[in-house]
């Protein structure tokens, strides 16, 4: 059960425009994550803008974004984040076999060199904050500066998401 109130639609009329924007940016959905964030409208608004940029306005292919997000969720034990992003990962071309192999990606043949570079970087940034030069050099072989910034923002951002969800004990929608 969430540690803060989950704002219901219509409960606070002054939030109706922001809720409409959330629904528009999130495919008509009003997730529990945003219902919790709306306890601080300015945080909810900034969060929405940042994650819309990361997910919908980035050059980085969604396949790599979603692999990184799922890996962050696994490393942080963030069930909500993981469950929410499996469908997006599948839509972006990640296979179910790859999703199943993510816990032990290092020994799996399901990932190509680019995907392995993304996962190694995600592991380092999530666990240690800094990635060693050889890990970053391998990543740089596959991605340009814009994509590197977007991937790093994705990994850092979804570490924020998982920590927020777990600290606030937000449950996934039923």
Regions found by a protein language model. Give the residues of each.
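Hydrophobic alpha-helical segments
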Residues: 1-174
């Amino acid at each position: 059960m969430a540690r803060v109130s989950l704002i219901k639609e219509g409960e606070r009329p002054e939030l109706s425009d922001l809720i409409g924007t959330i629904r528009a940016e999130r495919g008509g959905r009003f997730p529990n994550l945003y219902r919790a964030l709306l306890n601080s409208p300015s945080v909810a608004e900034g969060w929405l803008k940042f994650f819309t940029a990361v997910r919908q306005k980035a050059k980085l292919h969604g396949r790599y974004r979603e692999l990184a997000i799922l890996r962050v969720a696994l490393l942080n034990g963030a069930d909500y984040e993981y469950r929410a992003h499996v469908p997006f990962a599948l839509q972006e071309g990640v296979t179910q076999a790859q999703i199943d192999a993510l816990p032990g990606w290092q020994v799996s043949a399901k990932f190509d060199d680019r995907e392995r570079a993304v996962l190694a970087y995600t592991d380092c940034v999530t666990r240690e904050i800094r990635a060693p030069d050889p890990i970053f050099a391998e990543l740089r072989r596959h991605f340009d500066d814009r994509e590197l910034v977007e991937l790093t923002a994705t990994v850092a951002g979804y570490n924020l998401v998982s920590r927020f969800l777990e600290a606030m004990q937000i449950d996934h929608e039923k």
